Structures are given as C-alpha cells and as structure tokens.
C-alpha cells in the first residue's frame, strides 16, 4: 500500500475465523433485535453517525472511545461523532455485539424497549425485541439493568443471566450457547483505519501481532472483508 493519501482501498480477503471465533468475544456485547430508540433531544446539536448493514457479513466499526461494534445483518447503528463528557450513548436497530472500552468517567448506555443497560467496560450478550423478550448474559465484569417503568434494577455479575418475566427482572446462571461465533465467520470493515482493523485481527491471534509499517499507514482507511480463513493468513 502507498504510505500517503486518504483514499479508501477496497479489498476482499477470506479468513477462517472458526477456531478462534470465541476469543474476540471474551470482551464482547451481543445486542439482538434491539428496538430502535430515536435520538430525540438528547443528541440535539451533535453530529450523528449512521452505520447501516444490509449485507450478510458482520460490519465492524470502532467508536471514538475505542469500543468495537459488530453490527449484524439488516441492522442500523446511530451514535454521536463525539461522545459527551459523562456518558457514551448509542442507538441500535437490529442486532450487534459490542466490545466496550472501560471508562469509569463515561458510562456506556444502551436502551431497549423496556430496560436500560449501564456499562463501564465489560463483556455481555443482550437480546431484546418488540415482543418484550429480554435476556442479558454477562461474561466479564458487572452490568446494571434497570426497568424504565417501576424503577426495578439488578446488578448482573459474570456467569449470570437476567431475563424479563412478567415485567420483573429474574437472575439465573448463564448457559453457554456459542452463538457469538456466527458474527466472526464473515466480518467486514467499511472506511476503517488500518490500526483499528489490526486491533480486531490481533485480538483473534494474541501470539501473532500484526503491525503497520508506519504511523501514516496506520491512518489509511480501508474497506475489506474477511471470511473463512485464520488470522495468520492476513499476515
């Protein structure tokens, strides 16, 4: 690649993520069928970024704070170009995994139809849809889940799952489903900096850390797709 220029490079690579698919999601969040929450007045005056994924592959986006979003098929993500000083709030329609960067001074907020999720930096899976289904499983750290009506809230620790039953939040032990692997079998980056792409790829293979040849190259933006090959193939 040339070492200068800002133009987007379009490529398609094929990677085999199967045997290492779970690794990246040790620090991931899954949001499935989350209802669209309109930005409303909370984002007034802020420039909103809209990411839409209409393809079968997972669209991977890195937010301003370093959090990584794996956006599922037929899903849309809205977020401010610059987060507020005290919170990081995103709006999702569809499904996604989130790998949230820990920042105690900036709570990461996710809203669904009936509950609000507060994150400081942790790993968990969430399901929520228009029929009232809600399920959240924590893999690492702790998450607070609060009902929008009634004020009922619970703290969910690693290895625990919270579900919504008869308008009450219920805790239980987590059952591993291996669902996250389907999000990494075919992933795509759109206009992402090379350094952000390499951060995701390197997370898949901790023993093989790929680095760009220069800081200028790190800032080059790429559109690239990985499917059914190992991270070692990238190197």
Feature names for model-found ranges:
Residues 1-3:
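A short, acidic loop/turn at secondary-structure junctions
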Residues 5-20, 24-235:
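A residue-level detector for the "anchor" residue at the start of short, highly conserved motifs
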